[in-house]
Amino acid sequence: MELPATSGLNAQPGNAEGTTASTRPATALSVAERYLEALPLPAEARAALRREAGIEPADKDAVALAKLHRALARLDAAQTASIEGSVPAYASIGSRLDAAYGTPHAGTATPEPAPPLEHDTAGRIHLDTGPEPARRSMVPWPWVLGPIWRARRAIGRLFSGGTAPVPYEQPDSPDPKGIWRFVGARRRLTLLALMIAQTVAATWAMSSVLPYHGHDWLEAIIIALFALLFCWVSAGFWTAITGFLLLAFHGDRFVISRRAAPNAPIPDDARTAIVMPICNEDVQRVFAGLRATYESLQRTGHLEHFDFFVLSDSGDPDIRTAEADAWLHVCRALDGFGRVFYRWRRHRVKRKSGNIDDFCRRWGGRYRYMIVLDADSVMSGDCLTRLVQLMEGAPSAGIIQTAPLAAGRDTLYARIQQFATRVYGPLFTAGLHYWQLGESHYWGHNAIIRLEPFIKHCALAPIPGKGSLSGEIMSHDFVEAALMRRAGWAVWIAYDLDGSYEEMPPNLLDELGRDRRWCHGNLMNFRLFGSPGFHPVHRAVFVTGVMAYLSAPLWFLFLLLSTALLAKHTLIAPEYFTQPRQLFPIWPEWHPEKAAALFSATATVLFLPKILSVLVLWAKGPRRFGGAVHLALSMVIEAVFSVLAAPVRMLFHTRFVTAAFLGWKVHWKSPPRDDAQTHWGDAVRRHGLHTLLGLGWAALVYWLNPSFLWWLSPVVGALIVSILLSVFSSRVTLGRGMRRWRLFMIPEEVRPPRELRAMRKHLRQAPPTPDFRLAVVDPVTNALMCAIGTARFPHDPKLLEVRDATVLQALAAGPDKLTSKQKLVLLSDPLALSALHLAVWSSDVHRAAWLPANALASKAAA
């Protein structure tokens, strides 16, 4: 682990310039000297502190260090009886921070601002990481699920005198219906008619392919599954066709981006909070993206309307320390004190939605809007200001969701997914907007939210009941959109708005890990399908959320039953009389030409949207995607890859759905934010059974009927090569090689936006982050962690005993044996943390146990 630049732990003990190492035995003076060397002070300041401290050679280490901290804090005799005097390391917090950040570094043209330290009414030193609270009440309404609960509520209304709805069902938007709502209803009826007509035609064709045309019970089940799956695919097909027509010929007159002019002024009272909820994320990546977004917004000239909040739920003490240090460095680099804030939540309640709720309760009264970013989000200043302008121009809009563009990854898998979302995504988002209008999706990030109705209507109560599909809502975004629309506020997708970016999972296994959480969350959300007041569109969103994962076991069952039907016709004599009192036999019929036609039609439904997307890009200029030929070739390779990956996803999603219904727990971990590659051992463990299943399935079908294996080869073949597919698609070298060949190119790679270039630059130049050990040992990091905390009840004798016991326990256990909970307790208590800091420095044994390895190496070299 590297030390931060402000740390002096690697300095050689000696004179002020660090030229001559001291070889004398450890004394009180030498310990104090080492501590002074760990502070980034000029030689004159160190010499003055030595004189002021008045350390005697006979002083014990603890006494010498206490004198040094009192000298740092400029304590007089009257102050030594105060809390600062009894914990001298706590009293010196301000001086230590001033030593690191208060004096301009040599050679800097513009000195970075010092952290604004203050004393509260109790005289405690504090570095404010958040603005003054403007608290709001945010109370969730309990869910009413099922006919029994709804009947009880209706009876309660009857006896209470009237049938007036409860307050949360009353729309309070200035325009709860709007003309677009009736247009949207007609459009969705058209979509439903197209889906039904196409599904009926395909189902009839499927029945004509089967030997008994659906009269056999096994065939009837297969036809029913086919109809359900084809209807699901048909919805996406018509959405893409509609998006193609919009992008190729004309836009939608109801598009939300037409609600305000690009130069519309932003009122002074239209304050917006840009919030980034994080939990155990890559700290350097988080703050690099935040800084790039801040700088882009600053260039627009509208920075005064926005504040930034990093809302941390991190439970790792090392990451917690790194976050605070990164926040301080970003604030100094941007002069962002008072505009960039950091809040760490002690109790992680309701995961991400609870994190947002906590912000709304603390500071919701200060802002009109809130823009939610993910940990990997980057947004341009133009996009941010445009969102506020659109909110001002559409007073009935509750949420406006952008369509984030994926960029920034180098693995082959991620680059294929980036290409797919960049090329095909615009068709689907434009089509989705056409069908849904102001009753659309919210994806949880890169969106702007009107805070007043969000606070009033979108608090999430736990889902009642027992089991894994009850309790705290995991996938909160769809539910919040449904609640917002239930209150009469519109939810829009600004699909034509540029400047919104995110990152993709680097490999197949990481994407599937994310899918498991989403699967569980969508299955939970479906329990809210019958909750009163929801708009039919959002009930349909709950259905599509479930079908995104339930379609996998249905497809798997369809394939298994098709194999069983093959075995039945191969191993069992055909039945000619399948109905009672049947006079004439039913002859089994096989029509390979009809099967081929149905296969071609299904392939058209699946792949035509990809071809149409390429046609649109050809018309608009394919150079941004590597050229016309490379674009077409990339589309073909991506289509082949999607065919190979689909059966693998099918088996994983089948397992996820089964696990959710069986009550298996899901651990919500932050996804990787770097180009993580899949190792062979991980691939064999996760895909080994898939390979065996593919081999066994292929052997069985070949034994039953070799000609049928050709029809099943896309499935069993993909399972057989799943290990190779997972490993090689995660390779960074292959991804970069494809870029050299101009394959899977996207505009963000051909000509990267300024925001993404800035993010990568800040990530490369990010200083090393400290960990929990340095929060205890390093004078500067310790001062920072103490300054951002609050010394609660400093004079309570019982708490003083608890603090003393906590410090003694930490000294006895050492950093490696302390639990994360114990470390977080220390980080949350400035008095205990500063006392531990002093105790560790007062003992050679404890200092050796707590110092990082490279600092020990430097010390040994001295």
Curated annotation (Swiss-Prot):
GO terms for molecular function: hexosyltransferase activity. SUPFAM superfamilies: Nucleotide-diphospho-sugar transferases (SSF53448). Residues 7-25 have a biased composition (Polar residues). Its main location: membrane. Signal peptide: none annotated. Its EC number is 2.4.1.-. One of its GO terms (cellular component) is plasma membrane. Gene3D superfamilies: Spore Coat Polysaccharide Biosynthesis Protein SpsA, Chain A. It holds the Pfam family Glycos_transf_2. Residues 1-25 are annotated as: Disordered. The chain crosses the membrane at residues 188-210, 545-567, 597-619, 626-648, 708-730. Pathway: Glycan metabolism; osmoregulated periplasmic glucan (OPG) biosynthesis. Keywords: Cell inner membrane, Cell membrane, Glycosyltransferase, Membrane, Transferase, Transmembrane, Transmembrane helix. NCBIfam families: PRK05454.1-1 (NF003955), PRK05454.2-1 (NF003958), PRK05454.2-5 (NF003962). HAMAP family: MdoH_OpgH. This is Glucans biosynthesis glucosyltransferase H.
